[in-house]
Amino acid sequence: MIEAYRKNNPESQFGIAIADIDFFKKVNDTYGHNCGDFTLKELSRLFLERAAGKYTVCRWGGEEFCFFLPDLNLDQAGAVMQDVHAAVRKMPLHFADIDYAITITIGVEEYDFKSTTDVVLDRADRKLYMGKVHGRDQVVI
């Protein structure tokens, strides 16, 4: 999808973000895998509601999600992801009489017309990792 966008919009910029649920293993280990599945579904629902056709989000693997933010520069993509981050922090979760909350860490990068999509994804992933190393629950732009 991203490659098709680049081909059809060679002069357009876009943002890429990768989000990861903080301590997701703890959710599974503490409350069970059904609760973990519920968490992924609720988070997906929130992401899709916020996207509302403005950008694309998909599960990237495990508890990671990838966001494709067309026609946005780094600052604009970062602002969108700050809003997503804030929405997740406010999202109440209730499963089988358990009330709990989650946080996410997000790495945001921008396509710079020189790099391949893989390079941009790698840079976003490195920013995500830096956010994890420096305390989690943040957006690294």
Spans of model-derived segments:
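Catalytic-core segments of nucleotide cyclases and related cyclic-nucleotide turnover enzymes
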Residues: 74, 78-82, 96, 109-140
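Residue-level recognition of strand-loop junctions within catalytic nucleotide-signaling folds
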Residues: 29, 68-72, 89, 111-112
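Conserved long alpha-helical elements within nucleotide-processing catalytic cores of c-di-GMP signaling
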Residues: 2-15, 22-49, 58-62, 66-67, ...
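A short pre-motif secondary-structure segment
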Residues: 56-59, 100
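Short catalytic/binding micro-motifs of nucleotide second-messenger systems
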Residues: 5-6, 49-54, 86-98, 130
